[in-house]
Every structure is written in structure tokens, then in C-alpha cells.
């Protein structure tokens, strides 16, 4: 009798889990469809943000006709605020939600390649190079960096090649040097570390002394900043990656800080 009750309880739990998954999928489909309507778009984006870790959300977003175009239009609408200091927290949060959804697409193995090939990542670059350091701008900056960090974490050489081709590395170095919030410097240095640990990334950095000197200069500046204690591991890993290259190793003998 007790075994029957246990089996029944287990089956009920399993059925409830299946229903919850099904309901979540239905919710995602509903709000994905509502993104296409300007009147329901903002709320739909905010609702979908809560489900960004669902393993299928990338599929629904990417293959739903007109959805990515609508999200991209919202991104483009914010560009006008990049030349002024009038970006509200409300608008910044909306863009953060969209970029986070892009990250879900970028992380999914079934959509990552198409995401890179679409060049959508490039539309996030202006947020990285924006000069303003108010909280609303930094929210978007760190979220955009998060997409790149998530991509380089996959150990996909094509991601590194894409970053090299689109010449974003100097911008990331600048963020490392001048990041207003510690977390921004940490994310930026993590990206550089992963680039250096890639064969093509290391080759790109070391084939021109100007690039190598640019990185070592930024690393030196960061080491002198006492607020960068939490970033020491990433900095050391970048140095360790660089010395794998013979020429870089010789140059670092003269440029490494004494202590």
C-alpha cells in the first residue's frame, strides 16, 4: 500500500513538473509573439527577461518571424541617447532586458553560429564605447560586456575570430583601464584573458608590438590601482597567457612591474 502511495506521489510530482514546463513554454511563446506589437512590446520584453535561462527561449526568439527585427529596432532607438547624457534608468533597463535576451541566443549552441553570422553583436558595440559613466549607461555597458564574456567562455575559436575581425579589443582595453565600477573591469579583463588564451587571439595580439604594448600598459595601470584587488587573478592569467608567445615573453622581461 505504501509503495503504491509513493509511486502515485512521484507520478503526481512528475506530472506537475511537466505541466510547469509546458506552461512556461506557452508563456514564452505568448510574449515572444507580443514583441511584434509596439503596444505590448515593452511588457513582453520585461516578462521574457524573467525566463531568459529557459533552454528553449533562444529558439523561440530567433526563429519567430519579425521578433529579432523588433528587438533590434528598440536597440537602435537608444542610440540617440549615446551622444547626450539623458538616458533614463527606465530606458536603460529595457535595453538591458533585450541584451540579456540576445545573450540567451548567443549561448544556445543551436543559435550561436547564426547569431554571430548575423552581426547582431556589432550593434552592441556603441554601448561599450559610449563616454558617459552615469549608472544608466553603465548598466547597459556591463550587460553588453556580459554577452561577449558569455561567448568567449564557450571556448569557440570562431567567437575570438569574430572579435578580432570586428576590432573590439581596443575598446575592451579602454574599459579595463577606465571602468567606473569594479565589476566592469572584471568582465572586460576576463574577455581579454580568454582572447589571450586562444591560439588565434594570442597570435593577433603579439603580431604587432603596438597591440602587445597596449595590453601591458593597461595591465600595469590596473595593478597600480588598489581597488582592483578582485581582478588580480584575471590580470595574472593574461600575463601567463602572453608569455606563451616567445616575442611577448622577451618584451615582458622589460615591461613587467617589479612588484
Role assignments for model-derived ranges:
Residues 186-191, 210-220:
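Alpha-helical membrane segments in multi-pass integral membrane proteins
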